[in-house]
Design a protein with these regions (language model features):
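Arg/Lys-rich amphipathic alpha helix in sigma70-family domain 2
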Residues: 87-109, 185
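Helix-turn-helix DNA-binding module
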Residues: 154-171
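A short pre-motif secondary-structure segment
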Residues: 147-148
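A short, charge-rich alpha-helical start-of-domain segment used by transcription regulators
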Residues: 9-45, 55-58
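Solvent-exposed, charged amphipathic helical/linker segments at domain boundaries
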Residues: 170, 176-272
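Sigma70-family region 2
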Residues: 25, 62-82, 100-102
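Structural recognition of an alpha-helix C-terminal capping motif at a helix-to-coil junction
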Residues: 45, 59-66, 80-92
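Internal acidic/polar
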Residues: 104-126, 196-200
Length: 347
């Protein structure tokens, strides 16, 4: 990649000043991610309760973190409750995406019912991490879903929830009442929610024979440590993204970046790849064990997703979830496989 003084003023390209600031920004973002680690798992759990798949939850988390970094860079006052701040950003991001899609109309209403502030303890709390709860939650309209999760799972007060969702405590009470009533009614229905109600959004590539064949070819190239073969499976304009940390575009960047880091001679680990199906999608799991360590155990350390090119058996985008500990844990753990997580940043 050409940078700096190779370009005269006013010509296309990256100036020295831009290159230097990009390095500073990249390190600042990594420091920011590390600073948020204490609350990240809780914020991911909140995103997961709103979304139908692990992939959608991580997308929402990453968009939330990106917006949080931009907002933090413009704040002069301290952030008094980091988790609540991130939950507010995540909620607004999620609701905005629904509004843009035209799938839902979002209005607050205040009921005339005199509802208690907290109500009786709800059995939702004991089921907070169960997939059955997530399915039931998807029966609720967006704002009711957010209110139920924030109150019954995360134990925020009505005033705190009202602040996060930019509404009134009375409207939160009303949404909680309606949402809890819907969930209790659903629990009494032995048939449970219909698959149509809780199914994730369309994923055209999932389960498609051509998509699985592409993943198997890519996994075979990984296992052969054949970087030339790996690169040949990408579009010329293809992308490789280490989610939350790095993006590479084009054969040259992809070869020099993630592929050489993982499969080059200086890598500290030995890798092996397998193809699996999880949460509606065919994926690649990357296994690793330490090089030159006799008897070292092999564990899943990464989850990879491929977006195929339109009309061609090539990779348009490859996502590595190496620095997404919640995704690695949910996917590998859900498949009953040993795994390790890797923090949230290179440094």
């Amino acid at each position: 990649m050409t940078t700096g003084t190779d370009f005269e003023a006013g010509t296309p390209g990256e100036t020295q000043a831009l290159a230097e600031n990009r390095v500073i920004l990249r390190q600042a973002r990594r420091d920011f991610l590390v600073a948020l680690e204490p609350v990240r798992a809780s914020v991911y759990a909140y995103c997961r309760s709103l979304t139908p798949t692990v992939w959608d939850a991580e997308d929402l988390l990453q968009e939330t973190l990106t917006k949080a970094l931009a907002e933090a860079s413009q704040r002069y006052e301290p952030i008094r409750n980091t988790q609540a701040w991130l939950v507010r950003i995540a909620t607004n991001t999620w609701i905005d995406s629904l509004r843009r899609s035209g799938r839902v109309t979002l209005e607050w209403t205040e009921s005339a019912l005199d509802l208690p502030d907290d109500g009786a303890a709800d059995p939702l709390e004991a089921l907070a991490v169960e997939s059955a709860l997530r399915q039931l939650l998807h029966l609720l309209p967006p704002r009711e879903r957010a209110c139920v999760v924030l109150k019954d799972v995360f134990s925020y007060s009505l005033a705190e929830i009202a602040g996060m969702l930019e509404t009134t405590p009375g409207a939160v009470k009303s949404a909680l009442h309606r949402g809890r009533a819907t969930l209790r009614a659903a629990r009494t229905d032995s048939a449970g929610p219909s698959p149509e109600t809780v199914a994730p959004g369309p994923r055209a590539a999932a389960g498609h024979p051509g998509h699985q064949a592409l993943l198997r070819r890519l996994a075979a190239a990984f296992n052969a440590y054949d970087i030339d073969a790996m690169v040949s499976l990408f579009l010329a304009s293809g992308r490789s993204e280490v989610v939350g940390n790095a993006t590479e575009t084009g054969h040259g960047e992809i070869r020099a970046g993630s592929l050489t880091d993982t499969f080059g001679p200086d890598a500290a680990e030995i890798h092996r790849s397998t193809v699996h199906h999880f949460d509606g999608e065919d994926i690649i799991l990357m296994w690793e064990r330490q090089k030159n360590v006799p008897g070292a155990s092999e564990v899943v350390s990464d989850v990879l997703r491929v977006r195929p090119a339109f009309g061609a058996p090539l990779v348009a985008e490859l996502k590595w979830y190496f620095f997404c500990p919640e995704v690695v844990a949910e996917v590998a753990g859900g498949l009953g496989l040993p795994f390790k997580t890797n923090g949230v940043s290179y440094f």
